[in-house]
C-alpha cells in the first residue's frame, strides 16, 4: 500500500513539473522584467576589457514565454559582448523562459583606443522581442585611453605626464642610473600582482591640487579602497635619492619597500605630504634603510603602518600613523623598529621622531626593540603616542591621550577643535 502512495506521489510531482513548462503564452501583454533597466560600467581602459556584469531577465507570467529575439542593437560593431543563458553569443532567437522563471545575461565591454585624452562614452542596448513587445536594456561604459606598460624596463631618464593614466602589467623597473620623473596629477594603476621596481631614482612630485596616484587598476566602486590589489613600490640597493611628494599610495600588499641604506649623502627615500593607505601587510617596510618622512598620513594596514628592521636611519616629523582597520585583524603595533630581522645581519639603528601622532585601536602602537650588540640612537620628542611603556615619558611627549580625530572609523583623521593636540606642535621644518 505504501508503494502505491509513493507511486501516486511521484506521478503528481512529475505532472506538476511538466505543467510548469506546459503552454507558451502568446498574449501581447506578457512582458519581461529585468534586474535593471540600465547597465553602467565605470571607467574601462581601452583594449583591456571589463569584468562580466550580470543582468537577470524574469518571466513573471504563469505560463512560459518565447523570446523571439535577443540581440545587441549595435550588432557586430558593438563594443559590448554577451553571454546569454550560458552561451557566448550576441544574438539568440527563440529562447523560452518557463513561467515564474528567469535567465542570466552577462555583459562585457572592450573598447578600442582612440586619440582622446578625456574619458568618453560607449553606448549600446540589448533588444528583446517577446510576443511583439519590444523592450530594451541600455548599456553605458566610460572609456579611457591609457598608456600600457607590460614588464618594461626604463633604461634612460623618462618623464610620465598626466595626459593619460599608466596601466602596469607584471612590472615596471627603473634601471640603475636612470630616473623616472612623474608630473603632478599622473595616475599609475597596477594590474593584478604587478609592481614598480626602483633600481635607479624615482622623482614623483605632485601638488596639493594634483597629487600623483599609485593604485590598482580596478575601477569598480567595490575596489576603491580594497587592499591587496598590487604588490607596491620597491626601492632596491642601487637606488638612492628618490622622492615621493604629494602622492597617494593605496590598495597594495606592501605600499613601499626599501631594502638598504642610501649610496649617497641623500636619504634613500624622501616621503612628504603623502597618503599611504589600505595595505594587506604594511604601509612601509624598511630593511636597514634610510627614510625621511614629513607630514604624511598612514592608515589601514593588516600588520604595520611602518616596519623598520635590521637597523637603519629614520627621520620622521609631523606624520600621523592611525592604526585603524575595518577588514584586517591587526595584532601588531602600528609603528615598529628593530636593529635585527630574521635572516638579515643586525645593524645600528638611528631614529629621530618629532611631532608625530602614533595612535590606533590597540593598547601598544609603538615599539622599538634592540636585540643585538648594536648602537641604538633615538630622539623621540613632542609626539602623541599610544603605548604601554613609560620609556617615552617626558621630552614633551603626550602618552595615551586620545588625539581627538573627527571620525577614525570613517578614516577622517583631522583633529577636532577640542583636540588636546591643537597648537602643541613644534615648528619643525622639512
Residue ranges, per PLM feature:
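Hydrophobic helical h-region of N-terminal Sec-dependent signal peptides
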Residues: 8-12
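Short, solvent-exposed loop/linker segments at beta-strand-coil boundaries, enriched for Pro/Gly
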Residues: 73-91
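C-terminal motif of bacterial Sec signal peptides marking the signal peptidase cleavage site
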Residues: 14-17
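Asparagine-centered strand-capping/turn motif at beta-strand->loop junctions
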Residues: 57-61
Amino acid at each position: 500500500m505504501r508503494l502505491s502512495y509513493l507511486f501516486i506521489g511521484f506521478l503528481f510531482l512529475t505532472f506538476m513539473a511538466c505543467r510548469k513548462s506546459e503552454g507558451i503564452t502568446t498574449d501581447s501583454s506578457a512582458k519581461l522584467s529585468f534586474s535593471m533597466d540600465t547597465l553602467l560600467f565605470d571607467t574601462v581602459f581601452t583594449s583591456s576589457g571589463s569584468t562580466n556584469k550580470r543582468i537577470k531577465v524574469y518571466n513573471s507570467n504563469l505560463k512560459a514565454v518565447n523570446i523571439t529575439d535577443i540581440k545587441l542593437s549595435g550588432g557586430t560593431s558593438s563594443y559590448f559582448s554577451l553571454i546569454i543563458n550560458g552561451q557566448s553569443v550576441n544574438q539568440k532567437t527563440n529562447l523560452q523562459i518557463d513561467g515564474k522563471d528567469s535567465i542570466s545575461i552577462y555583459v562585457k565591454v572592450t573598447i578600442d583606443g582612440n586619440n582622446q585624452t578625456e574619458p568618453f562614452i560607449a553606448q549600446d542596448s540589448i533588444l528583446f522581442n517577446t510576443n511583439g513587445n519590444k523592450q530594451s536594456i541600455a548599456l553605458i561604459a566610460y572609456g579611457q585611453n591609457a598608456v600600457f606598460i607590460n614588464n618594461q624596463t626604463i633604461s634612460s631618464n623618462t618623464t610620465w605626464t598626466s595626459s593619460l593614466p599608466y596601466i602596469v602589467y607584471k612590472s615596471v623597473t627603473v634601471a640603475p642610473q636612470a630616473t623616472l620623473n612623474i608630473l603632478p596629477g599622473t595616475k599609475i594603476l597596477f594590474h593584478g600582482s604587478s609592481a614598480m621596481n626602483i633600481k635607479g631614482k624615482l622623482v614623483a612630485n605632485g601638488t596639493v591640487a594634483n597629487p600623483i596616484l599609485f593604485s590598482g587598476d580596478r575601477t569598480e566602486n567595490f575596489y576603491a579602497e580594497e587592499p591587496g590589489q598590487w604588490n607596491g613600490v620597491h626601492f632596491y640597493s642601487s637606488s638612492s635619492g628618490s622622492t615621493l611628494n604629494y602622492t597617494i599610495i593605496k590598495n597594495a600588499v606592501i605600499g613601499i619597500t626599501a631594502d638598504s641604506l642610501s649610496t649617497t649623502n641623500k636619504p634613500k627615500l624622501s616621503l612628504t605630504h603623502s597618503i599611504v593607505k589600505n595595505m594587506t601587510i604594511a604601509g612601509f617596510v624598511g630593511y636597514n634603510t634610510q627614510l625621511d618622512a614629513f607630514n604624511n598620513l598612514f592608515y589601514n594596514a593588516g600588520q604595520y603602518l611602518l616596519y623598520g628592521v635590521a637597523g637603519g636611519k629614520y627621520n620622521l616629523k609631523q606624520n600621523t600613523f592611525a592604526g585603524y582597520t575595518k577588514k584586517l585583524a591587526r595584532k601588531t603595533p602600528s609603528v615598529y623598529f628593530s636593529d635585527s630581522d630574521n635572516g638579515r645581519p643586525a645593524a645600528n639603528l638611528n631614529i629621530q621622531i618629532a611631532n608625530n601622532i602614533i595612535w590606533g585601536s590597540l593598547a601598544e602602537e609603538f615599539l622599538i626593540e634592540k636585540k643585538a650588540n648594536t648602537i641604538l640612537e633615538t630622539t623621540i620628542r613632542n609626539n602623541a603616542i599610544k603605548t604601554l611603556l613609560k620609556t617615552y615619558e617626558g621630552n614633551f611627549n603626550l602618552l595615551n591621550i586620545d588625539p581627538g580625530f573627527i571620525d577614525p572609523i570613517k578614516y577622517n583623521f583631522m583633529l577636532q577643535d577640542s583636540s588636546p593636540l591643537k597648537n602643541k606642535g613644534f615648528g619643525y621644518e622639512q
